[in-house]
């Protein structure tokens, strides 16, 4: 069974936890009735083993097994420093 590994890009909005960051994933959706394109944001908790991310960084993350109650994503790379 070959499942595709989910990867996303987002902006770090909080780095105050130990070995964890909060990443905001922004996507654009069409309003179901009016058709206007709206920005929607999802906040994810991400595992950052080396505490290398700072708020404002653009990062790539991938899904993994659940690491805690709210953490099931891990940091792959820092694409752009803040």
From Swiss-Prot:
Keywords: Ribonucleoprotein, Ribosomal protein, RNA-binding, rRNA-binding. One of its GO terms (molecular function) is structural constituent of ribosome. The keyword Ribonucleoprotein applies. Pfam families: Ribosomal_S17. GO terms for biological process: translation. One of its GO terms (cellular component) is cytosolic small ribosomal subunit. It comes from the Bacteria. The keyword RNA-binding applies. InterPro entries: NA-bd_OB-fold, Ribosomal_uS17, Ribosomal_uS17_bact/chlr, Ribosomal_uS17_CS. Part of the 30S ribosomal subunit. NCBIfam families: PRK05610.1, uS17_bact. Belongs to the universal ribosomal protein uS17 family. One of the primary rRNA binding proteins, it binds specifically to the 5'-end of 16S ribosomal RNA. This is Small ribosomal subunit protein uS17. It comes from Aeromonas salmonicida (strain A449). The gene is rpsQ.
């Amino acid at each position: 069974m070959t499942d595709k590994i989910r990867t996303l890009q987002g902006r770090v909005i909080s780095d105050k936890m130990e070995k964890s960051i909060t990443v905001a994933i922004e996507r654009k959706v069409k309003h179901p009735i009016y058709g206007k394109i709206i920005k929607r944001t999802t906040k994810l908790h991400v595992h950052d083993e080396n505490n290398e991310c700072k708020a404002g960084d653009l990062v790539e993350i991938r899904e993994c097994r659940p690491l805690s109650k709210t953490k099931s994503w891990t940091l792959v790379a820092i694409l752009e420093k803040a």
